Design a protein with these regions (language model features):
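Acceptor-substrate binding/catalytic loop of class I
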Residues: 116, 180-194
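C-terminal lobe and adjacent flexible extensions of AdoMet/dcAdoMet transferase-like proteins
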Residues: 199, 203-263
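Class I SAM-dependent methyltransferase SAM/SAH-binding core
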Residues: 48, 54-96
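Conserved class I S-adenosyl-L-methionine
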Residues: 1-43, 56, 60, 80, 138-170
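A short acidic, Gly/Pro-enriched loop at the edge of an enzyme's catalytic core
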Residues: 95-107
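A short glycine-rich, Lys/Arg-flanked "PGG" loop and its adjoining helix->strand segment in the class I
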Residues: 123-135
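A short SAM/SAH-binding and catalytic strip from SAM-dependent methyltransferases
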Residues: 105-120
Length: 263
């Protein structure tokens, strides 16, 4: 219950509603969108957006012609997402989806795995995603890099603060992010790039492919103008696409997207 309360308190502040529209969040959004557009079945596909927040991705999915159902545990997020044309939004838990077997052609978990520190819960959420996805459909899950907190606190100058350094050093070892103030995010789990493939496999999702979303560009793109003009932004996206599946660079990316076809 403590875990749920800490995460709920963070999201009830409403910061997630507009996070993907500006700064680093915009780069995460653009790269998630372009990778998914390459991998999703042609529209109209039935897409389940699990932990879809306020509907940032559900909005463009619906605009692309997909049939979108969003599931999220936060009433505030469901309220916002439910107001988007073409999006059906309901309350729910990634570990216990109230959805029939093989009902969707794509199931997305673009947030839930961040907030499940227990591996068993993460595997359960992935199993549920596989269960509700028809054979031949895809399951795609986003994870935060084990090293994102370290680079984030260095870039923001907070690593020199003793308590920030303590929790940051600890999460590099354990993956569990235990913040003491909400400027440092909320309780979360940061994956080593290799362990998500093992979790997919344990859930019955084999031959998983990983995509580094922001690469190292999340450390500078919003400050150096790479997201302010069509030409510069297009060049940045081209560059990131060229190295998105280079394993030696996975750890520097803030987020990975892992995808598997349900068999």
């Amino acid at each position: 219950m403590e875990t749920i309360a800490a995460i709920s308190d963070y999201y009830e502040r409403g910061g997630e509603v507009g996070r993907l529209r500006a700064g680093r969040g915009r780069l995460e959004f653009l790269r998630t969108q372009e990778v998914l557009r390459r991998l999703l079945p042609p529209a109209p596909a039935r897409v389940l957006d699990v932990g879809g927040g306020a509907g940032a991705h559900a909005r463009w999915l619906a605009a692309d012609g997909h049939q979108v159902r969003l599931v999220d545990p936060m009433p505030l997020h469901v309220q916002h997402a439910g107001a988007i044309d073409g999006v059906d939004a309901v309350l729910g838990d990634a570990r216990r989806l109230a959805e029939p077997d093989a009902a969707y052609q794509a199931t997305l978990l673009l947030g839930p795995l961040y907030h499940l520190p227990d591996r068993r819960d993460r595997v359960t959420a992935l199993r549920e995603a596989a269960r509700v996805t028809a054979p031949g459909g895809i399951v795609a899950a986003a994870t935060i890099s084990r090293y994102a907190g370290l680079y984030d606190t260095l870039v923001r100058g907070r690593y020199i603060e003793p308590e920030v350094r303590r929790i940051t050093d600890e999460e590099v070892v354990t993956g569990v992010h235990h913040p003491f103030d909400q400027d440092l995010f909320t309780l979360a789990y940061f994956h080593h790039p290799d362990e998500i493939v093992d979790e997919f496999a344990e859930a019955g999702l084999t031959r998983a492919s990983r995509y580094a979303l922001e690469g190292g560009a999340w450390l500078f793109a919003d400050r150096d103008g790479w997201l302010e003009g069509d030409e510069r932004t297009a060049a940045l996206l081209d560059a990131l696409r060229s190295v998105e599946q280079e394993p030696s660079l996975f750890g520097i990316s803030s987020h990975l997207l892992t995808v598997s076809v349900v068999r």
